[in-house]
């Protein structure tokens, strides 16, 4: 298994689906074999993949349509399906062992399990799930057991918050904390005021408002780090930027620590066990500096502040699209070795 490429299929070619495809196609240890999306043609799929307003044009190899069921990335053929019902997608025939479920629709265990009927061996849901086990790379992926066929990669915000919370809790202990994420626009929002029965504020124009919103990201940290269960909660502000978000974690510490000691601990971890997952910067950065950053969480040492040795506000950036999509692939690689 070690030298063989891991074969992956993607269901749903939206923001995350397309970026997961970009991540896969730039790596040597994984291979994209199939994409399913019932709502777009292969021609349109090519266009959407090739041109990206945030991450720029695809420049790694030529992409063309071979026929209505096949895309060519350079010489590499990728099978295209347009099937609505997940259990009818012939993943097995396409050779896909892992399926990335990125439609945003089939996020619970039973719905995602439909992919197994078509021959997939494992499914990774690229969203939080109410009942599938959630894994955050760098935090709890070592708890994955090979008999788990359906897992969730949690949310982009949980992937940013959990590594930071883990370091702080391991080193200083968290009594309790509140998180705010200042979060870029996502596809569920509206370009102008429109109907949104479940979330009235969420129906207001995305490019013109700061919109308070709920997020389960902080509570989900309690699922991946049980020792923090019930100690964290949070909310979100949706703001008119297209990508990159930032977590503000305000915590009460068990063990008194100066802000410099906290910085030192985070810096150490960012160069050690969490290298590539948790970053550390003392530069005067702003959000666009993190477009295309593949780390889950980049701690901004200059932006945080301490009120006392037991009460601090910590700030950490994340490319909520690219960083998260990279983790989806990392989780698959980890699962394949289990």
From Swiss-Prot:
Catalytic activity as recorded in UniProt: D-glyceraldehyde 3-phosphate + phosphate + NAD(+) = (2R)-3-phospho-glyceroyl phosphate + NADH + H(+)
GO molecular function: glyceraldehyde-3-phosphate dehydrogenase (NAD+) (phosphorylating) activity; NAD binding; NADP binding
Subcellular location: Cytoplasm
Documented EC number(s): 1.2.1.12
GO BP term (any one): glucose metabolic process
Residue positions binding NAD(+): 15-16, 37, 84, 320
Residue ranges of the region described as Binding to NAD: 2-153
Pfam families, alphabetized: Gp_dh_C (PF02800), Gp_dh_N (PF00044)
Region S-loop, residue ranges: 183-206
External loop as annotated region, ranges: 56-75
Keyword Cytoplasm applies: yes
Binding of D-glyceraldehyde 3-phosphate, residues: 155-157, 186, 215-216, 238
Alphabetical list of CDD domains matching this protein: GAPDH_I_C, GAPDH_I_N
Modified residues (S-nitrosocysteine): 156, 160
Involved pathway(s): Carbohydrate degradation; glycolysis; pyruvate from D-glyceraldehyde 3-phosphate: step 1/5
Protein family according to the UniProt entry: Belongs to the glyceraldehyde-3-phosphate dehydrogenase family.
Subunit note: Homotetramer.
Function: Key enzyme in glycolysis that catalyzes the first step of the pathway by converting D-glyceraldehyde 3-phosphate (G3P) into 3-phospho-D-glyceroyl phosphate. Essential for the maintenance of cellular ATP levels and carbohydrate metabolism.
Additional remarks: Plants contain two types of GAPDH: cytosolic forms which participate in glycolysis and chloroplast forms which participate in photosynthesis. All the forms are encoded by distinct genes.
NCBIfam families attached to this UniProt entry: GAPDH-I
The protein's name: Glyceraldehyde-3-phosphate dehydrogenase, cytosolic
Organism phylogeny: Eukaryota, Viridiplantae, Streptophyta, Embryophyta, Tracheophyta
